[in-house]
Amino acid sequence: MARRDQLTGKGPLSGNTRSHAMNHSKRRWNVNLQKATIKTENGSQRVLVSAKTLKTLKKHNLLA
């Protein structure tokens, strides 16, 4: 399963990690995914969302 937010589609970013000597190597910044249960018209559904999306869901009272 891809490390992607199931509601917003937000995925990992890529770039370089740099030392003080300016050496570089490729790395990946993954999304902080959390399991959440959201309200739907049929009841509730469990989804993987980013921490930022989870915060927004809590703000708008959309969690089951």
From Swiss-Prot:
SUPFAM superfamilies: L28p-like
Keywords: Ribonucleoprotein, Ribosomal protein
Region (Disordered) residue spans: 1-26
Any one GO MF annotation of this record: structural constituent of ribosome
Cross-referenced InterPro entries: Bacterial_rp_bL28, Ribosomal_bL28, Ribosomal_bL28/bL31-like_sf, Ribosomal_bL28_bact-type, Ribosomal_bL28_sf
GO cellular component: ribonucleoprotein complex; ribosome
HAMAP family according to UniProt: Ribosomal_bL28
NCBIfam families (UniProt xref): L28
Family: Belongs to the bacterial ribosomal protein bL28 family.
Name listed for the protein in its UniProt record: Large ribosomal subunit protein bL28
Annotated source species: Ureaplasma urealyticum serovar 10 (strain ATCC 33699 / Western)
Phylogenetic classification of the source organism: Bacteria, Bacillati, Mycoplasmatota, Mycoplasmoidales, Mycoplasmoidaceae
